[in-house]
Amino acid sequence: PVLLGISLLAFILGVLSPGGPAEFVLNQDGLYAPSEEQLEAMREELGLNKPLWLRYGLWLMGVLQGDLGSSYITGRDIAAEIAQRLPVTLELAVLALLMAGVGGIFFGSICAVYRGSFFDNFVKNLTNIMLSIPGFWLALILILIFSEQLRWLPTSGTGSLKYFLLPAFVLAFATMATVCRFMRGALLTEFGRQYFLVAKVRGINKFNLLTRYALPNAIIPVIALLGNYFASVLGGSVI
């Protein structure tokens, strides 16, 4: 029922969007407005004159059979379009996930171990700034510095790792701050639990206390957080 409701909502939003598919197909370059006769002919060709319930039913039956339809822009099968872009999306999402996860867990762990220190306070203030910076603004600044001024990284294209560094870092930037805070809080919670205090009394060194006792338990909710983040990146990200 939930998936059916989401599909119905997505279909209705597509229908209610301004312009409509017929006008979009006929006027992709935006240079002229098609006549009403042209629009009517295109609506007939695309099946847009059929009742809304019938159009939704035909679309849903096609989706259930693996037919996602054709793109209004390219005319190609949508499944083929997704298959063409999915590998690049996966590469970008995985790299952003690694940046956010490794950076957030590393700095969050240090902040928890040295709670109340200058480094802890500095990182907490830094994460406030990171969470308040818009992604598109950060992307523009990084492009100006690393692409326009230093000429180190490209601004577009795909291929080697250097093409993914800037967009992946921008996608991971705010999430890294969230993971850092989450990791710090989770570790501090584990530091106060009885099993950790008993292990500490037994004289186990700090590194083993962190890596063998606190970290395995504290990292579980962080992994769940990163899983949700990964799903959102795969669902579509705009910088």
Question: Which residues does each PLM region occupy?
Answer:
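Juxtamembrane/transmembrane-helix interface segments of polytopic membrane transporters
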Residues: 2, 6, 10, 14, ...
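Alpha-helical transmembrane segments of integral membrane proteins
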Residues: 82-119, 135, 148, 158-239
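Generic alpha-helical secondary structure signal
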Residues: 37, 51, 55-59, 63, ...
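Membrane-water interface segments at the C-terminal ends of transmembrane alpha-helices
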Residues: 9-18, 46-47, 61, 125-154, ...
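An internal, D/E-rich "acidic patch" concept
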Residues: 48-105
